[in-house]
Amino acid sequence: MAARLCCQLDPARDVLCLRPVSAESCGRPVSGSLGDLSSPSPSAVPAVHGAHLSLRGLPVCAFSSAGPCALRFTSARRMETTVNAHQILPKVLHKRTLGLSAMSTTDLEAYFKDCLFKDWEELGEEIRLKVFVLGGCRHKLVCAPAPCNFFTSA
C-alpha cells in the first residue's frame, strides 16, 4: 500500500521535504536528501519514531533521521508518461526493494532532475509542490511480478 505525500523542494538545503496528505498533515515534514538514497541500517530506524502521525501505508524508514530508503519520485499526474518514457526506473527501484545493486546515486539524481524538475520548469509552476508516492523498501517489502506493476497509482 502506498501513501500520498506532498513534496516541496527546499533550495536552501537542496532537499525534498515530504509531508503526508491527510487530516494530520500539519506535522513536521520528513526530509530526504537527494544525495543520500542508500538504505539505512535497521538499527538506525526507530520503530516508534513518527508513530504518533497515525499514517497507514508509510514504511517505518519514512520517519528515520536518515530519510526513507526508496522514494518513488513519480507524480500521479505524470506516472504514465514518466514510466513509459523511462522503463529503467521501475526496474531500478524494484531491484532496490530486493536489496540488489541497481543504479548509482548520481544516475538517480539525474533522473529526478531531468524528469521532474524539468516538468515544473516547463510548466512555469512557481510553487514546486506535487503529490508523490512513497513506499517499496526493505522495511516494507512490496513484491511485484513485473517491474511495470511496481508503481502504485495514488
From Swiss-Prot:
Alphabetized InterPro entries for the sequence: Transactivation_prot_X (IPR000236)
Protein name according to UniProt: Protein X
One Pfam family linked to the record: X
Subcellular location as annotated: Host cytoplasm; Host nucleus; Host mitochondrion
Predominant place of localization: host cell
Keyword Transcription part of the UniProt annotation: yes
One Gene Ontology cellular component annotation held by this UniProt entry: host cell mitochondrion
Stated role: Multifunctional protein that plays a role in silencing host antiviral defenses and promoting viral transcription. Does not seem to be essential for HBV infection. May be directly involved in development of cirrhosis and liver cancer (hepatocellular carcinoma). Most of cytosolic activities involve modulation of cytosolic calcium. The effect on apoptosis is controversial depending on the cell types in which the studies have been conducted. May induce apoptosis by localizing in mitochondria and causing loss of mitochondrial membrane potential.
GO biological process terms on file: DNA-templated transcription; symbiont-mediated activation of host NF-kappaB cascade; symbiont-mediated arrest of host cell cycle during G2/M transition; viral genome replication
Subunit structure: May form homodimer. May interact with host CEBPA, CFLAR, CREB1, DDB1, E4F1, HBXIP, HSPD1/HSP60, NFKBIA, POLR2E and SMAD4. Interacts with host SMC5-SMC6 complex and induces its degradation. Interacts with host TRPC4AP; leading to prevent ubiquitination of TRPC4AP. Interacts with host PLSCR1; this interaction promotes ubiquitination and degradation of HBx and impairs HBx-mediated cell proliferation.
Encoding gene per record: X
Family: Belongs to the orthohepadnavirus protein X family.
Keywords assigned by UniProt, alphabetized: Activation of host NF-kappa-B by virus, Activator, Apoptosis, Host cytoplasm, Host G2/M cell cycle arrest by virus, Host mitochondrion, Host nucleus, Host-virus interaction, Modulation of host cell cycle by virus, Transcription, Transcription regulation
Post-translational modification: A fraction may be phosphorylated in insect cells and HepG2 cells, a human hepatoblastoma cell line. Phosphorylated in vitro by host protein kinase C or mitogen-activated protein kinase. N-acetylated in insect cells.
